[in-house]
């Protein structure tokens, strides 16, 4: 075991890093041609730190390394880093030695080859770490797990199905519930558009239409059907409607379908998938809970 860790600081900040010896580099790409460092400190804004973290975690040399974010962190930083460094940077030395001891215990110090072993190893080596769900508008299901993506190599497991399987086997346990999303039954996408349609013919061609309710006979119809020679007359019982509240009233919203001419009070709601085009009733959509996950006791024993 090396007596002292080699530390790299990424970022062009001129602010000094006190308490530990280090080498500063402006970009993470500068590390590619150099021997691997033991600890990396990212002195970068959150967005750039997140990009650097994704690249570092996909590099097998830095997959399990201690990497800290010195500036403000976003969700990707929290998912892939060891958080903020200790205020006294000299405390990094015992943390690194503990990391070395744990790595030597896992699989006798040999880097794990299988995807599930890599994930368990990462969680084992980062005791306060978790598999964080991160919201991403570019993902069809609205959330993804950056840590799993960084560790997958040539494997491409379905993250949600894999997490459910690992939880059922007892290696992982559910953490905080982050969100609940609704997905298309056909393709599993969460890119859904909720539209009001005619309950008779399911067309979008509907419009609000003023209507009247005759108190004499109870007839409800479009206001235009009650107008005759400038007077309000019920088209059903021919009563003259003079006073709103005593002769007639205006119901809440009514709609007219421009395709089939149906007249109705409540439109039907459809969830239309923007990816595959299928339409479903909202209560038929798949509901998925989005959670963070952490290493379970059985997972620790497996390590």
Go through the PLM ranges and name each one.
Residues 5-6, 49, 72-92, 96-98, ...:
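Regulatory and interdomain segments flanking nucleotide-handling catalytic cores
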Residues 168-295:
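Cys/His-rich short segments
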Residues 41-42, 64-75:
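A short, hydrophobic beta-strand element within the central beta-sheet of small alpha/beta folds
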Residues 19, 63-64:
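A generic structural signal for alpha->beta connector loops
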Residues 73-182, 186-196:
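N-terminal alpha-helical interaction blocks
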Residues 1-58, 87-91:
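A short, well-structured beta->alpha microelement
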Residues 57-62, 189:
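Short, charge-rich binding segments
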Residues 36-39, 64, 80-84:
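Short, well-ordered alpha-helix to beta-strand connector turns
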């Amino acid at each position: 075991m090396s007596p002292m860790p080699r530390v790299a600081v990424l970022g062009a900040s001129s602010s000094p890093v006190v308490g530990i010896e280090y080498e500063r580099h402006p970009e993470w790409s500068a590390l590619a041609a150099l021997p691997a460092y033991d600890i990396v400190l990212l002195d970068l804004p959150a967005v750039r730190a997140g990009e650097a973290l994704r690249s570092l975690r996909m590099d097998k040399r830095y997959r399990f390394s201690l990497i800290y974010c010195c500036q403000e962190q976003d969700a990707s930083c929290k998912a892939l880093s060891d958080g903020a460094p200790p205020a006294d940077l000299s405390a990094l030395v015992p943390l690194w030695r503990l990391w070395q001891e744990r790595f030597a215990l896992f699989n006798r110090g040999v880097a794990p080859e299988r995807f599930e072993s890599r994930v368990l190893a990462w969680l084992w080596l980062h005791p306060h770490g978790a598999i964080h769900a991160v919201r991403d508008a570019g993902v069809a299901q609205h959330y993804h797990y950056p840590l799993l993506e960084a560790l997958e190599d040539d494997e491409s497991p379905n993250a949600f199905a894999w997490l459910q399987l690992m939880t059922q086997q007892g290696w992982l346990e559910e953490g905080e519930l982050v969100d609940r999303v609704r997905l298309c039954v056909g393709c599993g996408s969460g890119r859904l558009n909720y539209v009001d349609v005619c309950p008779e013919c399911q067309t979008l061609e509907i419009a609000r239409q003023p209507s009247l309710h005759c108190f004499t006979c109870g007839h409800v119809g479009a206001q235009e059907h009650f107008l005759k020679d400038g007077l309000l007359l019920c088209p059903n019982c021919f009563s003259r409607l003079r006073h709103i509240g005593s002769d007639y009233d205006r119901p809440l919203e009514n709609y007219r379908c421009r395709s089939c001419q149906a007249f109705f009070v409540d439109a039907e709601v459809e969830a239309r998938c923007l990816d595959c085009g299928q339409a479903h009733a909202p209560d038929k959509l798949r509901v998925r809970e989005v959670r963070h996950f952490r290493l379970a006791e059985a997972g620790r024993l497996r390590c």
